[in-house]
Amino acid sequence: MGTRPDEPGDRMSAPPTDRLAHTSSRGVFVTMGGFGGKTLIQLASTVVLARLLSPADFGLVAMVTAIVGVADLVRDFGLTGAIIQARKLSERMWMSVMWLSVALGIGLMLLIAASAPLIAWLYDEQRLIPLTLAIAPILLVNGLTMPMQARVQRDLRFGTLANIDVVSMLVGVGLGIATAALGWGVWSLVVMSGAGQVYRLVALWVASRPRFGRPHISREVLPLVTTGGSLFGVQLLNYATKNLDNVVIGQQLGPAALGQYSRAYALYLLPMQQLNGTLGRVALPVLSKLQDDPERFRRYTRGALMIIGYLTIPVYAVAAAVSSPLVAILLGPGWEEAATLFSILALAGIAQAIGSVLGWLYLTLGRAHKQLLFFVITRPILIAGYFVGIWWAGVEGLALVFGVLSLLLLIPELVYATSGTFMRVRDILAPIARPLVLAPLCFGAAFAVERATDGMPAILQLVLGVAAGVVPLLASLAIPAYRRDLAQIVGFVKQVRKPARTAPASDAAASGSAEPDEPTGESSAAARSDVDEVILDDAELARERKAEP
């Protein structure tokens, strides 16, 4: 079956290496732009909806989504990650994946709808029955969406995904705010989620133009299901860890307390979604294509970790220090508990920002089964911590135990995730060591100023606190090692601005069948390697060290 000209199809399973650097680095920034747009829209929705709705409204929806999310994981069954990691996929396999995903979506939609009374009984909240029935169809929408999104992502069409992400969120948030202003209450949150997902389905359908064929699930899809099964186990345990806290709080303390926690948790996720989500969407397909090239794989991973280290760890440190004025500005009065919870959750944010990169290693190196084994052992510890924490000190105790355990469990996982691979523990620790040193300094400076300005307008407290938190970052540039780190990040940015290199004319002529937009010179005439262009190579670093005074 032929491939349409505008769809890379299977040729993207092994793209020419001399375009991979440009594609991946530009993909990071295109995707970051998309996530940046989503972050601004999400912040705007948080600011507006927190003033139109009550904490209990957010808590009711969080109760339902904590359960529906489990069904959505079953619906995906790890197939998204398996598709991205696979070296090659035939058109027949694509059709089978699409029909399998649709079947799972329909089945789980009906199961959740039938379980609505049980969910209401669990929380002792009858208002959850109609909410559950209204949210359940999202499972079918996601079942249709998943294979199309995986295909677009596998084909490295990051600009398309970024545009769809932003517009779908804009559609959902716009309708959610409009209905909240009209007095729809909790139902405006249902509208916001559903409208965005429906638009996403339509946009991805247009972008990928799927061919479903006749209803049939081929046996060729079994390897994907096998790989996906391990990923599903990991995702299920991870989801349980990240959502059973909602169930525990909602069941023990009610929707109002859960509403405070859910808004704090949403703010805590923003830095991680913006940066780790951006890099992860690009890194997974790129690293999967570099799994047979250890040196380039290590360089790309170290570079991504360095960016995460400098742009995530200090952000959490400063945001935790100024959480009171930050939450007062974003959410308004009545959300003071959310500010305290956000500060505590920042501990988990730092641990999970680093831990997400370990997830890349498991997936792209085909070791999902090892991650599943680690999660089977460690995730029950985190879940038990929820019960200990809420018994000890309520919702704040739960958040603190979660943060501390997340940091402690990261240490053995560093060793476990790299054992038996060409990756070394040093490859993970070296890029984040210097940002970790800066984190307490940034927190201390920001917190001191925030306390000293207590009583001033919240916006002034926030600006002065953030400015103080940035001072240690700027002062660190007096140290050569930090300047070298900055040079590597700048080198990444420069790569984005360079046009993608094409093959010499002689090579193109010799090939005879090259398409105009495809590089053809993959011989020894190719200059620097692909990922070496994304992260400055050792020779360039050596020259920079010599040039420093």
Please place each PLM-identified region on the residue numbering:
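Interhelical loop/hinge segments that connect adjacent transmembrane helices in multipass membrane
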Residues: T3, G9-L20, S24, G159, ...
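Specific pore-lining/lateral-gate transmembrane helices of multi-pass inner-membrane transport
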Residues: Q85-S101, Q260-V376, F492-K494, K498
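Membrane-interface junctions at transmembrane-helix termini in multi-pass inner-membrane proteins
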Residues: S24-S25, A82-S90, V141-D165, L182, ...
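Membrane-proximal transmembrane or re-entrant/amphipathic helices at the cytosolic face
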Residues: G2-D18, T418, M423-V425, G444-P549
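Alpha-helical transmembrane segments of multi-pass membrane transport and lipid-handling proteins
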Residues: G2-G9, S13, W99-D124, P130, ...
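Hydrophobic alpha-helical transmembrane segments
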Residues: I129-A136, I164-P210, P223-G229, V234, ...
